[in-house]
Amino acid sequence: LYDLTTLQREANRYYGFTAQQTLDLVQTLYEKKLLTYPRTDSQFITDDMEDTARQVISIVCRQLPLFSDVSVTPDIARVTDNSKVTDHHAILPTVQLEKQDVSALPQSEQKILNLVGMRLLCATGEKHTYAETQISLSCEGYEFKTKGKTVVQNGWKSIEELFKSSLKTKEKDDLAKTLPEVHEGDVLDGVSASVTEHFTTPPKQYTEDTLLSAMETAGNDQFDDDTEKKGLGTPATRAGIIEKLVKSGFAERKGKSLIPTKDGCNLVCVLPEQITSPKMTAEWENTLMEIERGKADADAFLSGIVRMTGDLVKAYPFLS
């Protein structure tokens, strides 16, 4: 199911919405009582919500025209895990959707409802199963291998494909190779080969989709396993961080890409690594967890921050 960050990422990929636009839309739908609380970092629901989830799935199929022909036998257990729900469960449509004329909503809100509805149906739908075949070929002492897939049961993929077919910009799926029927020991005649030349390409510029993913996982290897908050920012603040960079002139949008400006590049060059590395964020979060457990002193932590700030101001006076 969707937490806020994953919803923001997919809304950017499918619709081109910025993280802030998605946050504003889900907040509006929450205030209209059509979506549950949006600022969540959980992708699961609790076991006491099973009946409600079944009811919501039926409502989604009745109320959202895109899914009117969908018939599902939901497996709610796949999205139920009490241990993975903290303050708030995953984002879901609410039972109030039953009373809503969806066609009267703005197109942008309808798109978010379709996205959240699709995720719920896919997450609880029938399993997608396929048979994978691997062929090994021997030629002139060299061994060549290839793989192909044959779909046995499309399952939840059919719902995802239905959703993607409604998009103006079609998503490209990875098409598995269809292999011819062969048997062990077959000899293939008339096989040809050719050489093609390819060049490495530089990494792609960040989109809000990929930047949100990077923020979510930044410095994770530096955090203790049981630290509650990891990465840069929280689901509720990451959109604001991106918008602040754009409004401050340190980044700009070009199509779906986020590009650092000259001022942004210069800022990163002059800032000390201590500030630009996610390691400091990890250290602070780890210490805050220790304070919560009574294993570290809050006053000493604050004094350390004050001391570090003073040292940085002295070492880099031009930044103040």
Specify the residue positions occupied by each region the protein language model found:
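Short amphipathic alpha-helical interface patches used for protein-protein assembly/oligomerization
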Residues: 35-41
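Basic, low-complexity terminal or inter-domain segments flanking catalytic cores
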Residues: 19-20, 24, 41-320
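C-terminal accessory/connector segments of nucleic-acid motor ATPases
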Residues: 1-25, 33-34, 207, 227
